């Protein structure tokens, strides 16, 4: 049965925007990180390129303008920008949020108040006037001096107000695990909402771990958007449970192409990938693993030794996360541990972190992919390369299992704790058998899904008349990875593993938030004592709107806050701990 899409959210023809020049579109993705992340860069670049080629003048939101200018394209000065389709990208720095849950919640509340004042029907407020708002006064010390933070907020809001559209490009960070990234996107969407700039959300994974507060932030963001696509069935179900219009699609980087395979990262002295890339084995298994125990490293080495003996696939270790200025950071640490356990007769190649353009070239040349990361599976499945995904937690299972499921390969995921007993070897053999007889029909079908979604997005942004929503997502049969009853046993173990990991993840999120608010309460109490000798009339929080930001304790399956506890009441952490233990 095909997945049901929501009804068209396209503007009626009478409301469609019309532009005398290329519309300015802000694309939000996790680019500009000094610790380079191949998948994050690839998703953003693919989205930006499609929009630019389709007629938009693209601005990329980045964590570091110089970094993105070096690895994506030359930065353009805003005043000198041509605002033409196909012109070099402009860049807008992120409004960065603190990591701690309490601090990011306070920051979003303050930014919301600044936006309200900026868009009120009166004279534009000054920095001094905005700085004395109670919500701004309550900002965490990491954002002091307040005047500088307010100026940055105003600049950020003004930049978004100047856009014709905002596209939140794909990613897996809309959850409490990466809550500061969720809030950074929420801030951009709220700025667009206040300025009546249309928002579009593409290729997202939602959750799976979300505190009730973070879930509310995400829900508002998605309801603001005119169009939402998600990249796995579980994310679609999350939207449907809340009555949010969404469509199932594929990852934004599914059709990523290397614009310049010779483009390299800026490495520390003495590090180079050139020779290793020139001397890759003729037949190899591409390995990307970001975490494993010592026992699992030994088991993975035995699996790779077996693949060399049985199939002639030499392991090529390809990092997807790492700092090019620190050759020992990121995935390569795990790769070195696994490679050290290989048999002396198994040839191995360890590559440093590569530019996304070079990474996709390595992936497409592989005979097999073994990965615990998401985008190696995406790139390989899209290229018809057999994949076995190794799953360390529910977060990875939801994403990589969801991606492979769209190709009918959802059974080819295995918890890292099940590497013993010959199961991985059986799954490798099954993946190779399927790849030998599989046609490219499903891959072509999914590429057409992405092409149609992008055409729909462009039609809405460009205002080319009323558009019908894309056709329902095509269904597919899942390919067995193991004979029965072994397949059923592995499925049951995978489900139990996922449930256990989800529970642990939710408990961590609640504990992290409780500890964060406890520290914030102590800070505010100390501040109140320092300036007034005791509590203010508004309690520990002062007048910054504590009603919206106090921590709550909830049941693990609850979707709404339970009773609000007064922050001054002692024993908050003890009560949370008792709830988690129960």
Which positions does each model-derived feature cover?
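Residue-level signature of the cytosolic catalytic core of signaling kinases
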Residues: 396, 565-568
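Acidic, proline-/serine-/threonine-rich low-complexity intrinsically disordered repeat tracts
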Residues: 550-566
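Active-site anion-handling motifs in enzyme catalytic cores
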Residues: 2-547, 553-555, 572-580
């Amino acid at each position: 049965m095909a997945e049901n899409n929501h009804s068209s959210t396209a503007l009626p023809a009478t409301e469609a925007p019309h532009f005398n020049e290329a519309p300015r579109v802000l694309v939000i993705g996790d680019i500009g990180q000094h610790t380079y992340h191949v998948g994050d860069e690839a998703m953003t670049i693919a989205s930006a390129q499609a929009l630019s080629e389709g007629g938009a003048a693209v601005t990329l939101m980045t964590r570091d303008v110089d970094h993105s200018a070096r690895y994506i394209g030359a930065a353009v000065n805003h005043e000198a920008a041509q605002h033409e389709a196909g012109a070099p990208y402009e860049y807008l720095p992120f409004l960065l949020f603190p990591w701690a849950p309490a601090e990011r919640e306070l920051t979003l509340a303050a930014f919301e108040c600044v936006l309200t004042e900026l868009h009120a029907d009166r004279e534009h407020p000054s920095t001094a006037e905005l700085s004395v708002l109670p919500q701004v006064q309550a900002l965490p010390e990491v954002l002091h001096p307040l005047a500088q933070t307010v100026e940055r907020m105003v600049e950020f809001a003004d930049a978004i107000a100047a856009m014709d559209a905002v596209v939140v490009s794909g990613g897996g960070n809309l959850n409490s695990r990466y809550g500061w990234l969720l809030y950074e996107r929420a801030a951009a969407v709220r700025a667009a909402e206040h300025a009546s700039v249309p928002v579009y959300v593409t290729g997202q994974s939602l959750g799976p771990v979300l505190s009730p507060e973070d879930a509310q932030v995400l829900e508002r963001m998605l309801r603001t958007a005119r169009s939402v696509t998600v990249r796995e069935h579980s994310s679609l179900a999350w939207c449907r449970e809340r009555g949010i219009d969404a469509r199932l699609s594929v990852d934004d980087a599914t059709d990523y192409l290397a614009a310049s395979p010779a483009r390299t990262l800026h490495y520390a002295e003495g590090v180079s990938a050139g020779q290793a890339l020139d001397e890759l084995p003729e037949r190899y298994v591409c390995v990307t693993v970001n975490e494993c125990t010592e026992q699992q490293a030994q088991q993975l080495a035995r699996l790779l030794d077996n693949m060399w003996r049985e199939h002639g696939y030499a392991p090529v270790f390809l990092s997807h996360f790492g700092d090019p200025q620190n050759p020992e950071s990121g995935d390569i640490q795990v790769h070195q541990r696994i490679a050290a356990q290989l048999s002396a007769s198994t040839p191995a190649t360890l590559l440093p972190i590569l530019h996304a353009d070079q990474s996709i070239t390595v992936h497409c040349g592989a005979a097999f992919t073994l990965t615990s990361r998401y985008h190696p599976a995406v790139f390989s499945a899209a290229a018809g390369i057999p994949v076995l995904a190794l799953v360390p937690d529910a977060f990875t299972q939801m994403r990589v299992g969801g991606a492979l499921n769209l190709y009918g390969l959802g059974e080819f995921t295995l918890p890292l704790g099940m590497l013993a007993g010959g199961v991985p070897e059986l799954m490798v053999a099954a993946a190779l058998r399927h790849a030998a007889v599989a046609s490219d029909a499903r891959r072509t079908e999914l590429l057409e899904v992405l092409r149609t979604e992008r055409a729909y997005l462009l039609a809405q942004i460009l205002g080319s008349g009323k558009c019908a929503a894309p056709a329902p997502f095509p269904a597919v049969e899942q390919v067995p990875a193991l004979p029965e009853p072994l397949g059923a046993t592995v499925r049951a173990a995978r489900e139990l593993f996922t449930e256990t990991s989800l529970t642990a993840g939710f408990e961590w999120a609640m504990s992290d938030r409780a500890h964060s608010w406890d520290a914030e309460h102590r800070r505010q109490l100390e501040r109140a004592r320092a300036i007034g000798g005791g509590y203010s009339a508004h309690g520990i929080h002062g007048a910054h709107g504590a009603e919206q930001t106090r921590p709550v304790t909830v049941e693990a399956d609850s979707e709404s806050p339970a009773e609000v506890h007064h922050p001054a009441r002692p024993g908050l952490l003890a009560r949370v701990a008792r709830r988690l233990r129960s």
